[in-house]
């Protein structure tokens, strides 16, 4: 992924240059020009919230599972197709283990935590089953989207068998309707995993 200033990304996306058209075509096919608005809104929220920093962009399209019923999380087979709506993440690496994750939708509270504090509540040496059981029994359900973030961070650390010593600050934005079975929560996990791999 390419890291340039967030403001330069906006300038590039608005440029209508040959490079911009090629970039959008390679990323989105014929729908490129329609997708710019969401990316620019998310970049602008990043600048307004975290400053004009060198950032990377990850994305994941929404998906339709023709069998439905969360069968993938129960070991079943999928019959998928993607849709144009997507989730976009604008990210910047940090030098410490803090994670500052904001959503374009203000109804979602920011997730602000360090990996060290997460490990106190969810020790990495615990089994994944124990971690999930503990998460299900939490009394604070005020921000369910935090659970997807916590699960992604812990699963990544457990799979790579190392604590996350460098955090990230990100803004996510999407146009996938929540609760519509188009995998908006799945996409949040995927763009966050992409950001962690980049980091």
Language-model regions, residue ranges each:
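ATP-binding N-lobe of GHMP and related small-molecule kinases
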Residues: 2-186, 190-199
């Amino acid at each position: 992924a390419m890291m340039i200033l967030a403001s330069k990304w906006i300038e590039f996306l608005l440029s209508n240059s040959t490079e911009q058209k090629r970039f959008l075509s390679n990323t989105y096919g014929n729908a490129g020009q329609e997708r710019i608005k969401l990316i620019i809104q998310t970049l602008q929220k990043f600048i307004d919230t975290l400053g004009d920093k060198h950032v990377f962009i990850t994305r994941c399209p929404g998906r339709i599972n023709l069998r439905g019923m969360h069968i993938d999380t129960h070991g079943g087979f999928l019959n998928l197709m993607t849709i144009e709506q997507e989730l976009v993440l604008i990210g910047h690496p940090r030098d410490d283990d803090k994670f500052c994750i904001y959503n374009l939708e203000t109804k979602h509270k920011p997730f602000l935590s360090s990996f060290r504090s997460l490990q106190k509540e969810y020790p990495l040496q615990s089994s994944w089953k124990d971690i999930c059981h503990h998460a299900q029994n939490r009394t604070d359900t005020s921000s369910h989207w935090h659970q997807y973030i916590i699960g992604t961070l812990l699963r990544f650390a457990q799979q790579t068998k190392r604590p996350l010593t460098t955090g990230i600050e990100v803004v996510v934005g999407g146009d996938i309707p929540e609760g519509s079975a188009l995998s908006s929560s799945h996409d949040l996990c995927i763009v966050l995993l992409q950001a962690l791999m980049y980091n």
